[in-house]
């Protein structure tokens, strides 16, 4: 064989080996990247798996143990709920009864929030409303709607059917005072876009839209209005916030599902398991530790009404009047 052909063949072989090595290195780096939680932009693990404190998905104790686990934490490491279908927990008629006046002519969000949109969105979060026994699952749905109804309420003290029948009257903040844009290299604000409160949880600020969009697979930085124009995305954004821990805050889900165990510091701050801690997670800096507060009472009123519809006990520690606020976490929801 002529020497030049041999050299050419050897060179091709070297190139092939180098290419295969680079491909292997790329696959290795991708497989070693963190999968969930704050290490992955707030992403949730698939199939209801636990997200460990280091950003990995699994269903054994190292992944699911508290404290540490960031989201979808289940004692003993059993993945919660097989499908995430909540139709067996909340019926269409219960949804309509809870949000009795959401389609009232006076409500700007009339016609927007639907039962089917909620059920569809919930399927993307297998642990939501499917963790624990039936009573616990119903309490979680009641707590979620209790908090989000306060965020979107159109009720007043003498409203027909009472103030707690008017949740989900709004789908976005009215007359926002700012663009809610904080300079960020990671989550830069898109030209002409505003990041005021939208959806059931009134998602606010560009970094929250960025984190949420990355987790649910939608570009919300460039399209924040989707949270107010697409009901499924609106519910997904709210449930994402609910399911995502904000260290040192636990997730709302972990609290209501009985997975969160308060530390000594939490106990000293008056933060004990119950609905009140969820209020602290969502808006504690403005509402908690101030004694009696009408906003906190409003959140409780919605929750108690919904628990009554589901026939479950709301439990204790419902308020955060005497709780110290958590230090600011990564996310902020309420306005």
Curated annotation (Swiss-Prot):
It holds the Pfam family Chitin_bind_1. GO terms for molecular function: chitin binding; endochitinase activity. PANTHER family: BASIC ENDOCHITINASE B, CHITINASE-RELATED. Belongs to the glycosyl hydrolase 19 family. Chitinase class I subfamily. This is Basic endochitinase B. InterPro entries: Chitin-bd_1, Chitin-binding_1_CS, Endochitinase-like_sf, Glyco_hydro_19, Glyco_hydro_19_cat, Lysozyme-like_dom_sf. The gene is CHI-B. It comes from Arabidopsis thaliana. Changing residue 17 to K: In strain: cv. Bl-1, cv. Shokei and cv. Yo-0. A motif (Vacuolar targeting signal) lies at residues 329-335.
């Amino acid at each position: 064989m002529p020497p030049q052909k041999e050299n050419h063949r050897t060179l091709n072989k070297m190139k092939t080996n180098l290419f295969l090595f680079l491909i292997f290195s790329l696959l290795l780096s991708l497989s070693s990247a963190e999968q969930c939680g704050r290490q992955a932009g707030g992403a949730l693990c698939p199939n209801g798996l636990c997200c460990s404190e280091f950003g990995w998905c699994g269903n054994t104790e190292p992944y699911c143990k508290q404290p540490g686990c960031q989201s979808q934490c289940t004692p003993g490491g059993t993945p919660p709920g097989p499908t995430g279908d909540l139709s067996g927990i909340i019926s269409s008629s219960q949804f309509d009864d809870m949000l009795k006046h959401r389609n009232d002519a006076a409500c700007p969000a009339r016609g927007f929030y639907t039962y089917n949109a909620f059920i569809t969105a919930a399927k993307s979060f297998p642990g939501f409303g499917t963790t624990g026994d039936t009573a616990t699952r119903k309490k979680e749905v009641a707590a979620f709607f209790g908090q989000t109804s306060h965020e979107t309420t159109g009720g007043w003290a003498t409203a027909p059917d009472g103030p707690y029948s008017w949740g989900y009257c709004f789908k976005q903040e009215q007359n926002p005072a700012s663009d809610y844009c904080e300079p960020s290299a990671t989550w830069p604000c898109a030209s002409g876009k505003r990041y005021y409160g939208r959806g059931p949880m009134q998602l606010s600020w560009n970094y929250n839209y960025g984190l949420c969009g990355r987790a649910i697979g939608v570009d919300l930085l460039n399209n924040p209005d989707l949270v107010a124009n697409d009901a499924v995305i609106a519910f997904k954004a709210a449930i994402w916030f609910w399911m995502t821990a904000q260290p040192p805050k636990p997730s709302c889900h972990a609290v209501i599902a009985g997975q969160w165990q308060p530390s000594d510091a939490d106990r000293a701050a008056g933060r004990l398991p119950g609905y009140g801690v969820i209020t602290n997670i969502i808006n504690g800096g403005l509402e908690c530790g101030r004694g009696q507060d009408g906003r906190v009472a409003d959140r409780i009123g919605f929750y108690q009404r919904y628990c009554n519809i589901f026939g479950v006990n709301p439990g204790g520690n419902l308020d955060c009047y005497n709780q110290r606020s958590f230090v600011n976490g990564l996310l902020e929801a309420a306005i």
